[in-house]
Amino acid sequence: MPSFDVVSEANMIEVKNAIEQSNKEISTRFDFKGSDARVEQKERELTLFADDDFKLGQVKDVLIGKLAKRNVDVRFLDYGKVEKIGGDKVKQIVTVKKGVTGDLAKKIVRLVKDSKIKVQASIQGDAVRISGTKRDDLQSTIAMLRKDVTDTPLDFNNFRD
């Protein structure tokens, strides 16, 4: 029985490369000369450092640009609040989201059942497994999910015949 998994996961290698490119650009840009602006990464948590709110916005723009160039969807980023860390310096913690949340998984299952396509959906941890008898049904399910779920980036992997 053909099946595939619906997941939501960023490519962390590309995220790391985008951070390195961002730090390189920040270190060479004229408007950041003499400032302590940078991006650090610990697992799935990115920390943006800057001298003030304006420069923090500039750091964020550079990071988003580099992520977009490396084909990492910026909807994976979850921004925390801006914190002051002494003097005028500020930092912001950005979390890279992973996995299909419970609410989104239920929404996907409901969409699949309401679509009247002859496939079954089951929640398996942080993924949703879609299985059906025909490959065409699975492909039309992928097209339907891409059209209807726009708030979270979805990946379709583990396609098996």
Swiss-Prot record:
Alphabetical keyword list: Nucleotide-binding
SUPFAM superfamilies: YajQ-like
Keyword Nucleotide-binding included in the entry's annotation: yes
GO cellular component entries: cytosol
Protein's name according to its UniProt entry: Nucleotide-binding protein BceJ2315_27070
Any one Gene Ontology molecular-function term assigned to this protein's record: nucleotide binding
Known role: Nucleotide-binding protein.
UniProt cross-references to NCBIfam families, sorted A to Z: PRK05412.1
PANTHER family: UPF0234 PROTEIN YAJQ
Family (UniProt): Belongs to the YajQ family.
InterPro entries: DUF520, UPF0234_N, YajQ-like_sf
Tree of life domain: Bacteria
